[in-house]
């Protein structure tokens, strides 16, 4: 099975760490966070993994190479340009990066999973994909329920009684939140999703594609699952991830 890891961001919220280290390479006890994701994907049968890279792309590619030593096949899609022999990164947005890959070579030919490269998770991906297929979904967001007093730190997903996504709220106040289900940056798609992503421009999953799917009334679902998830996008979250690994 095939998957994609989003690894092109600059990691501005974790500076100064990311001035010299791309976010997916931030170490959790001397092991890059992306390595945990590769191991999770392999465990659930995802052995062909595409990684979009941009900021400090060489750091990621030189460490993981073709993925053979991790038991998977890794390929890379660079976003940016080459000037005077140097790579200059310019990310295309999460959906734009996916589309660039598919336009160049139709890599995604069946149900596939997309993970953000800066989170530590222990999700049962097999069960998540099964739910996606049972719903006949074009796109699925894996959600996690959080206490109501924590919603203002996350992107909230609003669904109907059948799980169909109806709206999003970005870090709403406790009083304004219409849901306690949050977007974990874990997505499942069918290849037909590329019909709704334009080519050659910056296009984001959360900011562009998902609102478009809601407006269209597409079979776009959210599934709430119980799993450990730590986004290392902020320094306090990074230390939480380290403590989590130490405690097993």
Kindly give the residue locations of the regions a language model identified.
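Catalytic-core segments of class I nucleotidyltransferases/pyrophosphorylases
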Residues: 111-113, 120, 126-133, 146-149, ...
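Conserved catalytic-core motifs of eukaryotic protein kinase domains, centered on the activation segment
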Residues: 16-19
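A structural signal for short hydrophobic beta-strand segments in well-ordered beta-sheet cores
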Residues: 25, 156-159, 222
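A short, conserved acidic/glycine-rich loop-to-beta-strand motif
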Residues: 135-145
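Conserved N-terminal catalytic core of the sugar/cofactor nucleotidyltransferase
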Residues: 2-5, 13, 27-115, 125-127, ...
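Active-site metal-binding loops of divalent metal-dependent hydrolases
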Residues: 10, 117-119
């Amino acid at each position: 099975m095939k998957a994609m890891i989003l690894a092109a961001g600059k990691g501005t919220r974790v500076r100064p760490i990311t001035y010299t280290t791309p976010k997916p390479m931030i170490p959790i006890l001397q092991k890059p966070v992306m390595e945990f994701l590769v191991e999770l994907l392999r465990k659930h049968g995802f052995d062909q993994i595409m990684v979009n890279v941009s900021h400090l792309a060489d750091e990621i590619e030189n460490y993981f190479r073709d993925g053979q030593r991790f038991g998977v096949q890794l390929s890379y899609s660079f976003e940016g340009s080459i000037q005077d022999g140097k790579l200059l990164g310019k990310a295309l947005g999460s959906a734009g990066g996916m589309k660039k890959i598919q336009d160049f070579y139709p890599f995604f030919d069946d149900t596939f999973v997309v993970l953000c490269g800066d989170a530590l998770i222990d999700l049962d991906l097999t069960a998540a994909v099964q739910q996606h297929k049972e719903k006949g979904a074009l796109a699925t967001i894996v959600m996690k329920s959080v206490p109501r007093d924590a919603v203002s730190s996350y992107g909230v997903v609003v669904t109907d009684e059948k799980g169909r996504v109806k709206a999003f709220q970005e870090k709403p106040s406790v009083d304004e939140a219409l849901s306690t289900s949050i977007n974990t940056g874990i997505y499942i798609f069918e290849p037909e999703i590329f019909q709704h992503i334009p080519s050659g421009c910056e296009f984001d999953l959360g900011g562009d594609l998902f609102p478009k799917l809601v407006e269209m009334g597409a079979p776009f679902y959210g599934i709430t699952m119980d799993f450990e998830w730590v986004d290392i996008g902020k320094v306090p979250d990074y230390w939480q991830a380290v403590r989590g690994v130490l405690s097993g």
